[in-house]
C-alpha cells in the first residue's frame, strides 16, 4: 500500500494548494492495489507511479475509467476520478525491436508479396507460437495487446465498463496495424489461414468471392477504422433496402440478395453450432426448394387470402384461353358471388361449401312421413304451401303423406314454406289469419322453388293469405330449430344474435341450392330471364311486385311510397289456448326476418343493369386482375375501369385514392 506522504516521481508537478489527497483503487483481472495521489495528478504521473508496483513500463499501461480510455495529459479531476473510485488497468505486451533485443523466432506470415510487409517492427509472441492463428480480429496476442492474464479478461467485470468501439478504433489507429491492414493481399491470406474460414468458404463460395475483391476488403478496413462511418453506412443500407421493395422488380432483387448472400452465410453459421434436431425432413426439403433463386421476373400477382379459391382459379384459367361457352358459364357463375357478397352471405356459403359432411346432411336429409294418428286436422282455410290447389273449406281432411314427403325433400327446402313460428308455439296456439285478409296473396314458395331448383318449376298459383301459417301436422325439416323451445327463448335469441345470422340459418337450404345450381348454364339462363322480367315489372307495374312479395318493404322507394300491406290480421274471436299468444307485431317481424334475405337477392337481381352486364363481359379480364389484387368491390372496380378506359394500373391508383 502506498502511503499518503509518498513522494511523487521525478518530473511531476507539485500539488496545488487547493488539491486534495484521494485514494484510487487500480484493479487488474487478478490483482487489486490502492494508491494515494492528489486529484490534480495527471494520468501520466499516475501511470509512472503504478509502473513501479506492477513492474511494467508506463507506455504499456492503459487505464480505463467509466468505459473510457484515460489520456495522459488529463488530470484525475478532469476525468471524474474521485476518492474511493476504481480504475481498471490493462497491461500491453512490450514491443521488441530487432536491433536492441535478442532475436526470437519470428512469425512467418505467408503472403503473395512478403516484401510489402512493414519493416519498422515485427510481430512476436511470448511463447514463440505463431500469431494471427484465428485471423486478424481474433489473434490479439500476436499484436502485443495482451498480457499473460488477458485470456481471463472476457469473463471479468472489466468488460462491463469498456467501450468496445473506442478501443477498437484506438487499436486500429496504431501505425503498425494501419500498415498491416493496408496490404489487402496479406489480410486476405491471414483470413484464409483460419481453418474455420476455410471450411466456411468451401461450403459457401460466395464468401470467397467477397474476399477476392480488393475494393470490398479496403472498404471493410476503412469502416473498421471509423465506427461512425460504418453505422451510417448500415443505416443508409437499411433505408435503401426498405425503399427497394416499393420499386417495380425490387422484390426479386431482395429475394436474390437473400438466396445468394444472406442465406448461405446464415446456413454456414448454423452448421457450426449444429443443426436443429426438431426440423423434420419435409420442412428441410421445402426450405431447400424455396431457397433456389428465381431468375425470371414474377409477373403473377400475389394471391389474395380474403378471396375465394374458386374465383381466383377461375381468373387464372380465363387468362389461359378457354372456349366461348366456358367463358359465358364462368361469367354467369362469377356473378352470383357479387350478389351474395352484397348481402353478406357469400363468405358463409363458402365456409359451408368446404365442409362436405354438413352439405351431405343438408342436401341428402329427408324428413320421414308422420304417423296419421299424430296429424291434426286442418282448419278451414289452411292450404299446404306446396300444393297446386287448395282443398275445400271445412273438409277436415288430414294432410296426405305424399305432400308431407314432398315438403321434406331437400329439393324443396323448409325455407320455401313459412315457418310455424309465425303462428304456433309449443303446442300450437293458432291465429285465424285467413278470415280478415283482403285481396290475393303471394305464392312465394313456388317462386323461390323455381329459382332454387330447376327440376321443380311450377306455375304461379294464387293462394289465400293463410299460407303464412304452417300446418301443425307437418313435421319440421332437420335444418330448422326444434319446435320444443319456448317462444320466449327464441325471441331472446333473436334479439341477442345478429339478424343476418338468424336469417342465414333459417334460409340456408335455398342458398345452398342456389350455389349448386349456378354450375348449370340452363339455370343461369332462367335466372337471367327472371331478372329481365323483374326489371320490366319494376318499371311498368311496381304494384304487381308487391302482390308477389307482400312482406317486401324494401321496394317502397321503387313504388314511389306505396303503403305496405298487412300480411296477417288477427281474428276477432281467437281460440283460448294454454300457451302464450303471439302478437301481430311479433308474427309480422318474424315473417319479415325469415323472408328478407331471399327478397334481398331478388332486389339484387332486379337492380342489375343489362348494360352493366355487357361492361362486365367487356372488362372481364381486367376485373379478374383487380379481384386477384384484393379489390373485391365489383361496382367500384367497374366504374374505375370505365373511367380509365380499361387501364388496370390507372384503375388501381384510382381505387386507392377513393
UniProtKB/Swiss-Prot annotation:
Domain of life assignment: Eukaryota
One matching Pfam family: ubiquitin
Compositionally biased spans, kind Gly residues: 312-323
Ranges of biased composition (kind: Polar residues): 362-379, 389-400, 438-469
Domain UBA: 614-658
Domain (Ubiquitin-like) ranges: 22-96
Compositionally skewed regions (Low complexity) per UniProt: 280-291
Signal peptide: none
Domain STI1: 194-233
Annotated InterPro entries: STI1_HS-bd, UBA, UBA-like_sf, Ubiquilin, Ubiquitin-like_dom, Ubiquitin-like_domsf
Protein name from the UniProt record: Ubiquilin-3
The gene coding this protein: Ubqln3
Amino acid at each position: 500500500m502506498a502511503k499518503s506522504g509518498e513522494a511523487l516521481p521525478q518530473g511531476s508537478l507539485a500539488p496545488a494548494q487547493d488539491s486534495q489527497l484521494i485514494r484510487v483503487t487500480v484493479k487488474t483481472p487478478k490483482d487489486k492495489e490502492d494508491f494515494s495521489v492528489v486529484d490534480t495528478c495527471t494520468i501520466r504521473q499516475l501511470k509512472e507511479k503504478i509502473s513501479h508496483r506492477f513492474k511494467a513500463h508506463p507506455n504499456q499501461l492503459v487505464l480505463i475509467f467509466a468505459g473510457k480510455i484515460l489520456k495522459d495529459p488529463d488530470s484525475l479531476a478532469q476525468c471524474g476520478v474521485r476518492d474511493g473510485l476504481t480504475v481498471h488497468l490493462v497491461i500491453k505486451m512490450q514491443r521488441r525491436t530487432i536491433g536492441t533485443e535478442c532475436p526470437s523466432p519470428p512469425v512467418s506470415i505467408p503472403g503473395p508479396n512478403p516484401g510489402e510487409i512493414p519493416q519498422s517492427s515485427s510481430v512476436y509472441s511470448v511463447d514463440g507460437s505463431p500469431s494471427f492463428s484465428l485471423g486478424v480480429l481474433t489473434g490479439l496476442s500476436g499484436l502485443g495487446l495482451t498480457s499473460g492474464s488477458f485470456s481471463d479478461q472476457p469473463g471479468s467485470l472489466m468488460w462491463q465498463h469498456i467501450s468496445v468501439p473506442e478501443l477498437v478504433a484506438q487499436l486500429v489507429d496504431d501505425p503498425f496495424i494501419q500498415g498491416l491492414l493496408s496490404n489487402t493481399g496479406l489480410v486476405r491470406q491471414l483470413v484464409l489461414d483460419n481453418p474455420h474460414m476455410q471450411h466456411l468458404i468451401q461450403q459457401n463460395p460466395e464468401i470467397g468471392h467477397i474476399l477476392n475483391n480488393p475494393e470490398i476488403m479496403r472498404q471493410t478496413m476503412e469502416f473498421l477504422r471509423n465506427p461512425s462511418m460504418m453505422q451510417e453506412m448500415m443505416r443508409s443500407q437499411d433505408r435503401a433496402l426498405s425503399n427497394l421493395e416499393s420499386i417495380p422488380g425490387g422484390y426479386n432483387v431482395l429475394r436474390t440478395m437473400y438466396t445468394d448472400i444472406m442465406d448461405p452465410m446464415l446456413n454456414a453459421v448454423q452448421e457450426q453450432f449444429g443443426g436443429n434436431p426438431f426440423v423434420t425432413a419435409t420442412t428441410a426439403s421445402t426450405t431447400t426448394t424455396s431457397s433456389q433463386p428465381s431468375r425470371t421476373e414474377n409477373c403473377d400477382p400475389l394471391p389474395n387470402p380474403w378471396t375465394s379459391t374458386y374465383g381466383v382459379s377461375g381468373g387464372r384459367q380465363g387468362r389461359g384461353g378457354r372456349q366461348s361457352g366456358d367463358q359465358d358459364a364462368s361469367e354467369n357463375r362469377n356473378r352470383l358471388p357479387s350478389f351474395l357478397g352484397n348481402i353478406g352471405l357469400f363468405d358463409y356459403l363458402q365456409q359451408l361449401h368446404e365442409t362436405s359432411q354438413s352439405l351431405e346432411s343438408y342436401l341428402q336429409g329427408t324428413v320421414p312421413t308422420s304417423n296419421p294418428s299424430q296429424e291434426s286436422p286442418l282448419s278451414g282455410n289452411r292450404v299446404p304451401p306446396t300444393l297446386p290447389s287448395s282443398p275445400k273449406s271445412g273438409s277436415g281432411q288430414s294432410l296426405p303423406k305424399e305432400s308431407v314427403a314432398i315438403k321434406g325433400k331437400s329439393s324443396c327446402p323448409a325455407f320455401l314454406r313459412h315457418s310455424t313460428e309465425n303462428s304456433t308455439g309449443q303446442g300450437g296456439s293458432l291465429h285465424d289469419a285467413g278470415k280478415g285478409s283482403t285481396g290475393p296473396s303471394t305464392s312465394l314458395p313456388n317462386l323461390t322453388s323455381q329459382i332454387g331448383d330447376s327440376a321443380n318449376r311450377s306455375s304461379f298459383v294464387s293462394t289465400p293469405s293463410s299460407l303464412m301459417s304452417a300446418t301443425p301436422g307437418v313435421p319440421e325439416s332437420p335444418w330448422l330449430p326444434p319446435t320444443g323451445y319456448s317462444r320466449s327463448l327464441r325471441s331472446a335469441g333473436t334479439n341477442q344474435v345478429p339478424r343476418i345470422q338468424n336469417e342465414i340459418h333459417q334460409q340456408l337450404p335455398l342458398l345452398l341450392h342456389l350455389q349448386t345450381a349456378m354450375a348449370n348454364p340452363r339455370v343461369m339462363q332462367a335466372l337471367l330471364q327472371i331478372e329481365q322480367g323483374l326489371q320490366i315489372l319494376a318499371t311498368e307495374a311496381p304494384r304487381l311486385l308487391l302482390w308477389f312479395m307482400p312482406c317486401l318493404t324494401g321496394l317502397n322507394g321503387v313504388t314511389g311510397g306505396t303503403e305496405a300491406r298487412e300480411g296477417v290480421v288477427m281474428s276477432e274471436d281467437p281460440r283460448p289456448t294454454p300457451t302464450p299468444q303471439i302478437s301481430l307485431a311479433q308474427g309480422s317481424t318474424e315473417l319479415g326476418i325469415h323472408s328478407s334475405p331471399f327478397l334481398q337477392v331478388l332486389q339484387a337481381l332486379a337492380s342489375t343493369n343489362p348494360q352493366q352486364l355487357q361492361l362486365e363481359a367487356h372488362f372481364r379480364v381486367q376485373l379478374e386482375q383487380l379481384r386477384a389484387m384484393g379489390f373485391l368491390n365489383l361496382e367500384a372496380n367497374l366504374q374505375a375501369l370505365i373511367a380509365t378506359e380499361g387501364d388496370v394500373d390507372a384503375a388501381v391508383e384510382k381505387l386507392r385514392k377513393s
